[in-house]
């Protein structure tokens, strides 16, 4: 992804929230569901309830191929749900479709 996009990596959602609160506005957020300190679905809810960040598309990553979890997260505002492990080319295609 680094060849096509400027990427910033955060260790956990609180670190990402701090980065966003400093005025950084990404075109897209990719978030794992299982993370330390705050779950990905909680991070998604925070973003979608915040006027400044609710328009940022969020792609959720999970090692679980759960239809019910996928549907729930898409209904809660995720732009896409990708199951790990995934093909990097597929991820690039999905990102391009979201950003175009």
Task: List where the protein language model places each region.
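Two-component/phosphorelay signaling modules centered on CheY-like receiver
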Residues: 1-8, 49
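Acidic, metal-coordinating helix/loop segments flanking the phosphotransfer/catalytic sites
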Residues: 9-28
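Receiver (REC) domain active-site loop signature in two-component systems and cognate sites
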Residues: 35
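Short, conserved "switch-loop" micro-motifs in signal-transduction and mechanochemical regulators
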Residues: 64-65
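C-terminal output helix
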Residues: 86-95
């Amino acid at each position: 992804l680094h060849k096509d996009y400027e990427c910033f990596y955060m260790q956990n959602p609180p670190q990402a929230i701090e980065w966003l609160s400093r005025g950084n506005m990404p075109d897209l957020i990719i978030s794992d569901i299982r993370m330390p300190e705050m779950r990905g679905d909680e991070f998604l809810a925070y973003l979608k309830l915040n006027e400044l960040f609710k328009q940022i598309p969020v792609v959720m990553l999970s090692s679980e191929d759960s239809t019910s979890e996928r549907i729930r997260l898409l209904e809660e505002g995720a732009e896409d749900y990708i199951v790990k492990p995934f093909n990097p080319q597929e991820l690039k295609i999905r990102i391009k479709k979201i950003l175009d």
